[in-house]
């Protein structure tokens, strides 16, 4: 049985990575695909754990070689998911989660129409602003650009299957887990997973 592909997107500062990490800790059946990026690591970020950090030239080379499942220019830097991180795992029956932006999500849905997509929203504009400022990693000019980009990102929430409002972290994580559980209980998935049982029951 082929694995399920999950897409999770959110504006910067909505708590996407924290929710994803907490959810995956509860649900080890899902593998997180580590994205490639051309930007420099931020303080505390480690290669191959948070991102695969490569130069812009290396990223372009991967584009030309057709190595990416999806890629997009995000906040002036390239981000993308390698084919090798997704296609073999799905074919082997493993569930894979992509933590990407709306541009990448749109590309993925064109290739995998049955992918399950989730968009995370902040509880308010004020909360988004406060969360972004707590990072303390950007200048005011960069902060203004990121807030504008966050608004642009949120305009695309209607393209996703599920929406989570991250007002209370534990509730948001529980809602993400519920989405994964519901996906596994879909009739098509259960029909494949329990084909022998269903056949025996209906004989």
UniProtKB/Swiss-Prot annotation:
Subcellular location: Cytoplasm
Classification via InterPro entries: GK/Ca_channel_bsu, Guanylate_kin-like_dom, Guanylate_kinase, Guanylate_kinase_CS, P-loop_NTPase
EC number, as in UniProt: 2.7.4.8
Uppermost EC category: transferase
Pfam families given in the database record: Guanylate_kin
Reactions catalysed, as given in the entry: GMP + ATP = GDP + ADP
Residues the entry annotates as binding ATP: 10-17
Function: Essential for recycling GMP and indirectly, cGMP.
Family: Belongs to the guanylate kinase family.
Protein name, as recorded: Guanylate kinase
Gene behind this protein: gmk
